[in-house]
Amino acid sequence: MAGHTENEIVIAAPLDLVWDMTNDVENWPRLFSEYASAEILEREGDRVRFRLTMHPDDEGRVWSWVSERVADRASLTVRAHRVETGPFQFMDIQWVYEQTPEGVLMRWI
């Protein structure tokens, strides 16, 4: 069954800081509380392939999967997709960054 989710948030911080922090995959466990670890498997230019591992769920299961991201600083977008199975069947996400008077609008589509 295919699904579609969109989320957004305005972060009251400079665009460069938001871009740098949210694209620093190695530090995602400090930025996103659901991740226990992030291991970089391969990096080439703006493309990074990595393994994310979550903290154990309520039943003690630990989910892990491999994803790939391609960041495009000029267009303020990042394309991400799941390479290896994980807790979901599909994942294809576009991260969109937009400077607003209130801060940086981040959208996940």
Curated annotation (Swiss-Prot):
Instruction: Tell me which Pfam families the record gives.
Output: Polyketide_cyc
Query: InterPro entries, alphabetically?
Result: COQ10_START (IPR005031), START-like_dom_sf (IPR023393)
Superkingdom in the source lineage: Bacteria
Annotated coiled-coil positions are: none
Q: What's this protein's function?
A: Involved in developmentally regulated synthesis of a compound biosynthetically related to polyketide antibiotics which is essential for spore color in Streptomyces halstedii.
- Describe the family membership recorded for this protein in Swiss-Prot or TrEMBL: To polyketide cyclases.
Q: What protein does this entry describe?
A: Putative polyketide cyclase
